[in-house]
């Protein structure tokens, strides 16, 4: 199997702390670059776990269409700003961040006080603007998850009137692009390919970590296929061979042998395959000459039966 390597040729961190990594993967056999690119892209975009804001509680507010005295932004704007916060959590439990800010002030993500399990990635992201003589008291709920989770307004656990739910986007990878190109021709004239992949994350994880996690998930997904075992469904009998379906009449046996077998409820080759030579001799009026005749007839169509029951 062709051995390839992965090189990160570019890494950028923008003002909002999002990160971009560009990787070259190769050399690959023809067609493998597209296969690898599609598989990694699907895992990166839809299967990596991330952290997101799932609910917000604002003192004195019980619905998202309200306004807050002394705060420039309305509640919908504040919810949108909170939804765009980039945080990481090292626990699968619900974490809550709180702040109380008096004006005049621009309330930022870094003002939120979380436990040591949570880190705010972009602390300078604004949440609200508070005028002099006013204050803002805010509580933010963050959770870990995968993909996208819409608000469930029928969930009893989230039915508190002052807890404003947010559609949660847990995806830490914002964008994945890839291209393929041909590289040097290998010995024997077969062309090689190279995969160029660009990964953009929200800053809660590096592009390198995102690639590694996606690759490990693909390995876990495909590993069971390496040891496929056949399981017979209960109650389903295998199809009999064509020879087994041959009727007794087509074996051209003597009249004596044919009549004895018919009286013993033997109607086809399939029925005979359940007999041994000793079993044939136990059929009434069925002697060794008739038994030998049956053995020869079966051998002509490529079927043999055992001499005794113990050798079945």
UniProtKB/Swiss-Prot annotation:
Alphabetical list of InterPro entries matching this protein: DNA-dir_RNA_pol_insert, DNA-dir_RNA_pol_RpoA/D/Rpb3, DNA-dir_RpoA, RBP11-like, RNAP_asu_C, RNApol_insert_sf
Reaction equations catalysed: RNA(n) + a ribonucleoside 5'-triphosphate = RNA(n+1) + diphosphate
UniProt KW keywords: DNA-directed RNA polymerase, Nucleotidyltransferase, Transcription, Transferase
Pfam families per the UniProt record, alphabetical: RNA_pol_A_bac, RNA_pol_A_CTD, RNA_pol_L
GO MF entries: DNA binding; DNA-directed RNA polymerase activity; protein dimerization activity
Keyword Transferase in annotation: yes
Entry EC number(s): 2.7.7.6
GO biological process, one term: DNA-templated transcription
Top-level taxon of origin: Bacteria
Residue ranges of the region described as Alpha N-terminal domain (alpha-NTD): 1-229
HAMAP family listed in its UniProt record: RNApol_bact_RpoA
Family designation: Belongs to the RNA polymerase alpha chain family.
Subunit architecture: In cyanobacteria the RNAP catalytic core is composed of 2 alpha, 1 beta, 1 beta', 1 gamma and 1 omega subunit. When a sigma factor is associated with the core the holoenzyme is formed, which can initiate transcription.
Domain comment in the entry: The N-terminal domain is essential for RNAP assembly and basal transcription, whereas the C-terminal domain is involved in interaction with transcriptional regulators and with upstream promoter elements.
Name the record gives this protein: DNA-directed RNA polymerase subunit alpha
Organism lineage string: Bacteria, Bacillati, Cyanobacteriota, Cyanophyceae, Synechococcales
């Amino acid at each position: 199997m062709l051995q390839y390597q992965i090189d990160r040729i570019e890494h950028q961190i923008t003002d909002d702390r999002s990160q971009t990594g560009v990787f070259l993967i190769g050399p690959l056999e023809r067609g493998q670059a597209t296969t690898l690119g599609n598989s990694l892209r699907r895992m990166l975009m839809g299967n990596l776990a991330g952290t997101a804001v799932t609910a917000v509680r604002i003192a004195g507010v019980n619905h998202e269409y309200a306004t807050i005295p002394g705060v420039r932004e309305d509640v919908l704007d504040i919810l949108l700003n909170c939804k765009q916060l980039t945080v990481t959590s090292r626990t699968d439990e619900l974490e809550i961040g709180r702040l109380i800010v008096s004006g005049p002030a621009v309330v930022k993500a870094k003002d939120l006080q979380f436990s040591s399990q949570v880190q705010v990635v972009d602390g300078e992201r604004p949440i609200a603007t508070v005028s002099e003589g006013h204050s803002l008291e805010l509580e933010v709920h963050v959770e870990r998850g995968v993909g996208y989770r819409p608000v469930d307004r029928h969930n009893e656990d989230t039915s508190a009137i002052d807890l404003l739910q947010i559609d949660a986007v847990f995806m830490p990878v914002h964008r994945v692009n890839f291209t393929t190109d041909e590289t040097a021709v290998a010995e024997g004239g077969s062309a090689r390919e190279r995969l160029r992949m660009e990964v953009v994350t929200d800053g809660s994880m590096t592009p390198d970590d995102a690639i590694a996690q996606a690759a490990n998930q693909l390995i876990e997904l495909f590993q069971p296929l390496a040891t496929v075992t056949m399981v017979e469904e209960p109650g389903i009998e295998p199809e009999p061979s064509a020879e087994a379906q041959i009727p007794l009449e087509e074996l051209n046996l003597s009249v004596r042998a044919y009549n004895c077998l018919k009286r013993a409820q033997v109607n086809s080759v399939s029925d005979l395959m359940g007999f041994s030579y000793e079993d044939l001799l136990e059929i009434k009026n069925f002697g060794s000459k008739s038994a030998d005749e049956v053995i020869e007839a079966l051998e002509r169509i490529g079927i043999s039966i055992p001499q005794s029951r113990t050798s079945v």
